[in-house]
Amino acid sequence: MSKSKFERKKPHVNVGTIGHVDHGKTTLTAAMTVVLAEAFGGDARAFDQIDNAPEEKARGITIATAHVEYETSERHYAHVDCPGHADYVKNMITGAAQMDGAILVVSAADGPMPQTREHILLARQVGVPYIVVYLNKADMVDDEELLELVEMEVRELLSDYDFPGDDTPVITGSALKALEGDDSEIGKPSIIKLAEAMDEYIPTPERPVDQPFLMPIEDVFSISGRGTVVTGRVERGVIKTGEEVEIVGLKETQKTTCTGVEMFRKMLDQGEAGDNIGALLRGTKRDEVERGQVLCKPGSITPHTKFECEVYVLSKDEGGRHTPFFNGYRPQFYFRTTDVTGSCELPEGVEMVMPGDNVKMTVSLIAPIAMEDGLRFAVREGGRTVGAGVVSKIIE
């Protein structure tokens, strides 16, 4: 049974484990693959297969991440687990592994610890929408009241960061016992319960093709007798010939009509998320559009210059800066297809930022960019990447 192929008919959801070091994230990840493979098919993965995560590069940053997949009665899940704390920070900020929901692992024996708090804060900052809690190592706690106390602490911590602490599912168990095949309540049944909680509590994400149309503009051409063509890869949604679109960013927003969509030199009726297309724009002059703007469904996204963000600053070993930067630092911010200069305002009490740190800051750009919460960007100095960030809150 366990070798059966995944049924791709089930909806697909991306999740990941977060939480303090040694609270059992990787053990839980392994237990989930084993118990769910037995119950619903799929491949079991051993702890050491997950723990020796390969390094991958995302936006020039090296991140160690393990990817596993499993299914439940309702869904197919892709699950990421990172070996080290720094990998989590980088992963969440770069969006290398986008999460529709997270499983927060807290050791019942220790309660919430500094990284528990930090990961919840990061989840809030980078826009992880839902968190489900697994209170692990319950076999090491004899006192029922202590378990309740830890659960209360975790719920309060979630509420502190604007997650609905009171409504969050909290499953108590022991990932190790489950992995060992224990059938008592805290063993395998706790994993099934966790899977059910994920199915119920984490909504199925909207597919990119169902979202409002957006295409970052990479190039602009003028075709004599036909007009102006902009090219790029459709990020989300669908564009049909004859539809009205907006050009947003860098200049005043303009409305125009898409009079043709072409792909591989063929004219099409429409282009959709994932397609590399050329869009012919009615009445738009070659010099009114440029790389760095976006083509989008009217009213779906607006241009902004000032925002709060969470930034990971590359270490020297990663090819980043060798020295710290201070308040008023002015690098370039690379959004989608272009660099815009901006100045950085550090939080009160933060004198400087060292390579390898992550920091919350406020940025003011010299030109507006089509922006929404959760938008990823790179921080660059003269074309060299020195950081990665995500917009956490738009100010103006």
Swiss-Prot record:
Residues 174-176 are annotated as: G5. It comes from Alkalilimnicola ehrlichii (strain ATCC BAA-1101 / DSM 17681 / MLHE-1). Pfam families: GTP_EFTU (PF00009), GTP_EFTU_D2 (PF03144), GTP_EFTU_D3 (PF03143). InterPro entries: EF-Tu_GTP-bd, EF-Tu_GTPase, EFTu-like_2, EFTU_2, G_TR_CS, P-loop_NTPase, Small_GTP-bd, T_Tr_GTP-bd_dom. Residues 19-26 are annotated as: G1. This is Elongation factor Tu. Mg(2+) binds at residue 26. Keywords: Cytoplasm, Elongation factor, GTP-binding, Hydrolase, Magnesium, Metal-binding, Nucleotide-binding, Protein biosynthesis. Coiled coil: none annotated. GO terms for molecular function: GTP binding; GTPase activity; guanosine tetraphosphate binding; translation elongation factor activity. GTP hydrolase that promotes the GTP-dependent binding of aminoacyl-tRNA to the A-site of ribosomes during protein biosynthesis. It is found in: Cytoplasm. Monomer.
